[in-house]
Design a protein with these regions (language model features):
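Phosphate/diphosphate-binding loops
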Residues: 291-323, 406-412, 417, 443-469
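Non-cysteine beta-strand/loop elements that form the S-adenosyl-L-methionine
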Residues: 319-337, 427-438
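Flexible glycine/proline-rich, aromatic-decorated loop/lid segments
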Residues: 341-345, 425-462
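Divalent metal-binding segments
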Residues: 21-34, 42-308, 323, 327-384, ...
Length: 476
């Protein structure tokens, strides 16, 4: 984010009360910003065709601020208006900041992120942007110099989509790191790369069967090459020592503090297992959450889901909400795990994996919906999206009242044109990530071909069909 634009994204508190909140005038505001270019974003939404709302502060010369001063009291917006109007909210203890024309925006809300991973990755080897196996290994070496023998070296960020036709192997990684198990997670988490010591620690050898919905890449002799795809990744990641509760809380706080510095006021945690959820609850009870958390329980953690079916949705806290569940229906386009209606263009005979074969529990998902929880289902391929729509429509048909829970399809990345019109009638939100379009640009058409790619990243087409969209960065 451009720091001169942020002052900082409305103080990381959110635009929760725009105008006229004049309570507590006697003591005055806690904080006042003056002489800013304030964009309240309180005008109407764009039309389905993208036309700007009639009441938006926009003309032929561009966008214009609709206020210049903001008053804050007890973590809430007290007043928004002109610098002169704001004077009534001055008190003896008010801090006033002249922002000298800087842009002030409402706090940001990210609707799909992985907070603990965002924090954890700050202490792992960062491989984002590496172009070759050798570059990746050099970066691991530079970042892990001095690591004691036997200790795990963990990194992340190599692009499984970009590297899918030339995956590395354990050979060079093992030569460089003979005395440490090394596990390197891909950019989106749908592939992992390990050295031989890591494979041995995890008990992965030529006899290891592939789990449903996963692949262990093997050489001509049947030995694992060091690359595990989709659900097979857990065979290796499970061998890495779990963080302590204190470390996990630290990862979560690091992730949230990183977001707070960039102007976020709330985040949707896309999948929280028991340990993560309990950490959120401890942090909330101690008043330590710096950003509001909308926790989506992990459907893969059945015990946690059963616990919350008994408890019911939790919405009473100002800092932690738990009324949603995250599920995976298929895998990723980059790893060719997303479920397609027809063969992958660059792998004839292969259509990806979905549903029960990818660990989707239809019965538990329906129970969670019927217990009052919103569900957000990860679906990327056109078949994955179609089958997810089939499932959601069937549950809603038997329980029409649950449509009000605003169920979601996470990513909705490749949607067949025949299915675009099915979202809105069922009230299903398309929770999409514009960065994926940019990240996948170099290989997406290779995967699905020139015709199917027209249904990929189809934000405007979905919006024209009346579908509610929510955008996010899929931070991790």
């Amino acid at each position: 984010m451009n720091r001169s634009v942020a002052v900082v994204a409305l103080l990381c508190i959110g635009l929760t009360c725009l105008v006229g909140c004049r309570d507590n005038l006697e003591s005055g505001a806690d904080l006042i910003l003056v002489n800013g270019r304030v964009y309240t974003l309180s005008w109407g939404e764009p039309a389905a065709d993208g036309s700007i709302a009639f009441d938006a502060p926009h003309d032929e010369s561009g966008w214009h601020p609709d206020a210049e001063a903001v008053a804050v009291k007890d973590g809430r917006i007290l007043f928004v208006g002109t610098s002169d109007e704001i004077e009534i909210h001055q008190g003896g203890a008010t801090q006033t900041i002249d922002v000298h024309g800087a842009t002030v925006l409402p706090g940001f809300v990210d609707s799909h992120a992985h907070i603990q991973e965002l924090g954890r990755e700050r202490v792992q080897v960062n491989l984002v942007g590496v172009e070759t196996e050798e570059d990746a290994i050099d970066r691991v070496a530079a970042s892990s110099d001095g690591t004691p023998d036997g200790q795990w070296i963990v990194g992340w960020g190599w692009d499984e989509g970009e590297w899918a036709n030339r995956y590395p192997t354990a050979d060079k990684l093992s030569e460089r790191f003979p005395d440490n198990p090394v596990m390197l997670r891909s950019l989106h988490g749908f592939a992992v790369w390990g050295n031989r010591m890591a494979l041995a620690e995890a008990g992965i050898d030529r006899q290891t069967p592939e789990p449903d919905g996963g692949r262990i890449l093997r050489d001509s002799a049947g030995n694992p090459t060091g690359i595990l795809i989709d659900r097979a990744t857990t065979l290796l990641t499970a061998a890495v020592p779990e963080p302590t509760d204190e470390q996990l809380e630290g990862f979560i706080l690091t992730g949230l503090e990183t977001m707070a510095r960039d102007g976020y006021v709330a985040v949707h945690q896309a999948g929280a297992d028991s340990r993560i959820m309990h950490a959120f609850e401890r942090l909330e009870a101690d008043g330590r959450l710096p950003v509001r958390v909308y926790a989506m329980l992990s459907l893969r953690d059945e015990a946690l889901c059963r616990e919350w079916i008994e408890r019911g949705p939790y919405t009473s806290s100002t800092m932690l909400t738990a009324r949603s569940v995250k599920a995976y229906y298929d895998a990723a386009l980059g790893s060719r795990g997303a479920r397609m209606l027809e063969d992958y263009s660059d792998r004839p005979g292969h259509r990806g994996v979905s549903g029960t074969n990818y660990g989707f529990d239809f019965d538990l998902a329906a129970e969670m919906m019927q217990a009052g929880f919103q569900i957000g289902v990860h679906a990327i391929g056109d078949a994955g999206n179609r089958e997810t729509l089939d499932f959601l429509e069937s549950v809603i048909a038997g329980n029409p009242e649950i449509m009000a829970q605003r169920h979601r399809i996470e990513h909705a990345q490749v949607v067949h044109p025949d299915d675009i019109g099915r979202f809105a009638p069922a009230g299903i939100i398309a929770a999409m990530q514009p960065p994926h379009c940019v990240e996948d640009m170099s290989w997406a058409e290779d995967r699905v071909g020139p015709e199917r790619v027209k249904g990929a990243y189809a934000w405007r087409t979905l919006r024209k069909a009346g579908v509610h969209l929510t955008f996010s960065a899929d931070l991790a």
